[in-house]
Regions:
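Conserved, structured core segments of small domains
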Residues: 1-129
Length: 129
């Protein structure tokens, strides 16, 4: 079964990154690199990407009496997508285990960042299981 694991955050959480020490940032990047490598080598990783900050996003609509392209994420959004993993695992429980490990990425002082990871089954995969 395929799942998407979505790391979300608020603007305040990501503004917080600017205050992290270089060592703390390097520790988090090293964790993510090792985590992704482990998923890839175990054969469960389909794809993973980190995303640019929301200020760089564009929202595109069909038009119809409005601007078809606007800056940023939806203004009413409190959270935004920071990155994702697509995994192919045998059970929802395995997807939850992997999501919990992703949430353990170190934050300042090496403490787990506890970032929320939303887990959703990919619909096309649901019909094949």
């Amino acid at each position: 079964m395929k799942y998407i694991l979505m790391m979300t955050g608020t603007k305040a959480q990501f503004d917080w990154y600017a205050k992290w020490s270089r060592q703390d940032l390097q520790a988090q990047f090293a964790f993510m690199h090792a985590f992704n490598k482990e998923l890839r080598e175990s054969g469960v990783l389909v794809a993973t990407e980190g995303l640019a900050f929301p200020a760089e996003a564009k929202v595109v609509r069909a038009g119809l009496n409005g601007e078809p392209i606007t800056d940023g994420v939806f203004p009413e959004s409190k959270e935004f997508l920071a990155g994702y993993w697509i995994i192919d695992v045998e059970s929802p429980e395995r997807a939850y285990e992997i999501a919990a490990r992703a949430s353990m990425a170190p934050g300042p002082g090496g403490q787990p960042s506890n970032m929320p990871i939303e887990v959703r089954q990919i619909v096309s995969a649901a019909s094949n299981s």
